């Protein structure tokens, strides 16, 4: 029943777009409700019904401004499709939720998610190759953003000290999750305050802070041969480049080869964009920041993880907070990186 209602909403959302759909399939219901669409000419598209109230129309239009600028810079991102009357977004009713949302359409991006290609059984050389490519992609996007001048109408939230570790962080008060013990809560609050102070001191110099993707984890990167495509720009924000890099690494921290993954990703980044040692020294802290922020994100979206996964995530972050308190938070030491030809 729920699936049928979503498919009905998708058909309504497609009406304003210049596409004659012959097949619509539900792909995912997470931050957005996402569909794969095929038209009568065999072309494929991605349709997204954006989470109601998460972003204003102005913020969504700003997302499109940046993705179009990235396309113009030669960076692989999904190509947006406008409605017949030239709008980037169409409005659609969601009867199941009793709400209206904005819908967007883009050409289908080929490839397989990087997440599906990397696990504990993956050969080290493949891990290094993929994460060197990922580091280079993040650096390329940071280069574009650092030189880009958004128009006055550009509106996005800030993942700065307040947005990440403030008293009202963008993804919620993670220290108030119901399954956190009093001792864990005190540790999270202590760590949050210290990280907030650290980020304030770090500052927002344009060489380290601009518009960022902010969610370029391996599930949001498609691998198609030697090409990586960045997808899902729903969380773009003003933020730090090293936070962007930390997001790319965060989900791989518990893999046995994380040392090699980290080394490859950083080298791929540095092959494309110069980065100061002062900035790289912030990477362990940004990895912790990402983990803490994710606790808040999943607390508001429990359907995206099992209780066991949520507990494991929380326990891992608590262990990192203890390392941070003890002054031993660091990145793992990796064997020498296998030298790879740059793919960017």
What residues fall within each predicted segment?
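Conserved NTP-binding catalytic cores of kinases and kinase-like/nucleotidyltransferase enzymes
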Residues: 1-88, 225, 337-344
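An alpha-helical support segment within catalytic cores of ATP-dependent transferases
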Residues: 5-13, 146-150, 165-213, 340-341
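Active-site acidic catalytic loop and adjacent metal/ATP-binding pocket
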Residues: 30-42, 46-47, 80, 196-242, ...
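ATP-binding pocket architecture of kinase catalytic cores
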Residues: 40-149
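A glycine-centered beta->alpha junction motif in the catalytic cores
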Residues: 52, 86, 99, 105-121, ...
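A cross-family kinase active-site recognition segment
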Residues: 121-183
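ATP/Mg2+ or Mg2+-diphosphate-binding catalytic cores
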Residues: 174, 294-344
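Active-site activation/catalytic loop segments of kinase-like enzymes and analogous catalytic loops
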Residues: 241-274, 288-305
